Design a protein with these regions (language model features):
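Nucleotide-sugar donor-binding catalytic core of glycosyltransferases
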Residues: 1-110, 114-137, 156, 162-177
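Short, C-terminally biased terminal segments at protein or domain edges
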Residues: 150-156
Length: 177
């Protein structure tokens, strides 16, 4: 079992390339920050990433996020999805949670952007320059998701409208991602 075999097998690479091509032929980036998505929030994440001593500073972040989701009336799914299903789910979701992994960043931020899904991240000053001009929802703490009367869905809907105005409207054009 090797990293190369797991992530770069010919079959997996071809499936992912076909999926990317199909998704990008559907509609221009940012045209879908709204009404055509099937689900509001993709919540699948595990705790194992932050168990490493290398990332002690992020320990507890994902557990805290899970508690916030529960209090805000959201269901958290922690199931592992095959890569194709994972990409399709990102493409069908308006937002996805991208808690820190082995660093303040997460691969999910970039995967989400690639599939027209808005990543929800913890605001981290050194990364603001990376996110400038991108539809990334940076929150000061996970508790901010509860600021609309304790309802995560209402908070995200309000932010979706703001982000659509900024990134999906005529002012920015269709190619904003």
């Amino acid at each position: 079992y090797s990293f190369k075999r797991r992530f770069f097998s010919e079959n997996t690479t071809l499936q992912c390339a076909a999926l990317h091509a199909a998704l990008f032929q559907q509609r221009p980036p940012c045209s879908s920050i709204g009404s055509r998505k099937r689900q509001l929030l993709f919540t699948s994440f595990t705790d194992w990433t932050t168990a490493s001593p290398m990332v002690a500073g992020h320990r507890g972040t994902r557990e805290q996020l899970r508690r916030v989701l529960r209090r805000g009336g959201m269901v958290h799914a922690s199931t592992h999805l095959p890569k194709g299903a994972y990409y399709r789910t990102l493409a069908q979701s308006t937002f996805c949670l991208a808690p820190p992994g082995r660093g303040p960043d997460s691969h999910r931020v970039w995967e989400a952007l690639m599939f027209n899904c808005i990543p929800v991240v913890l605001d981290h000053a050194p990364q603001r320059a990376l996110w400038r001009g991108l539809p990334v929802l940076a929150v000061r703490s996970w508790e901010e998701l509860l600021s609309a009367g304790g309802n995560v869905s209402e908070y995200l809907e309000a932010r979706r409208h703001e982000l659509h105005s900024e990134f999906g409207g005529a002012r920015r054009g269709a190619g904003c991602l």
